[in-house]
Amino acid sequence: MKFHSASEDATSLVLTNYPDVVSIAKSGDLSADAWLIGSGSPSLKVIPSAAYIVLDSTAMTLASTHSFQQNHAIVITPHEGEARSLGFPINDPSERLPVALSMARSLNVYVILKGPATIIAAPNGLHSIDTHGIPELSTAGTGDVLAGLTASMLASWQPRSANEIVETLGYAVAAHGCAAAIAREKRNPITATDVLEALPLVFTEK
């Protein structure tokens, strides 16, 4: 895994806790199978090249302000409030699916619209709906776990077609929801770290 932050303090904190992570600030190597771009990134002057780019939090504005290469699969992960900020308001639960599809088509991105029933939508209209999520996933930081899981699964599975990409995103969302449910069995309320630490159990359960 490679990591970059404009903050030296943040970089130091990450490297102290995760010594296997490579700091781009030190290596200068921007090559990767997938990139996750998060908070504080709209000011980026150079967007790293990768087959898959996941935009989370304030970086989702890049979906409408940056011209990505056509062969890139761009994924955004908004909740309803963020969808509204991007210009796609949802005024009623019945509007979630049509708005997700409109967002995907208009921005030419894959959308993971988070919520009670998370919607995965592709630019060509393909979509799926996941119901594994639980209310506790509204806890701060759990969306970051989903974004990281999504990027890592895209990098690992290397889906090519729209159908394969939607399927991969669906697996990420389902695993995230199942991990939260496992974490809740141990304690409640749960934290984002609880969800992260429960993920290995999801992938080892039969």
Q: Regions from the language model: what does each represent?
A:
Residues 134-137:
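Glycine-rich phosphate/pyrophosphate-binding beta-alpha loops
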Residues 139-178:
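Short, small-residue alpha-helix embedded
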Residues 17, 177-206:
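Charged C-terminal helix
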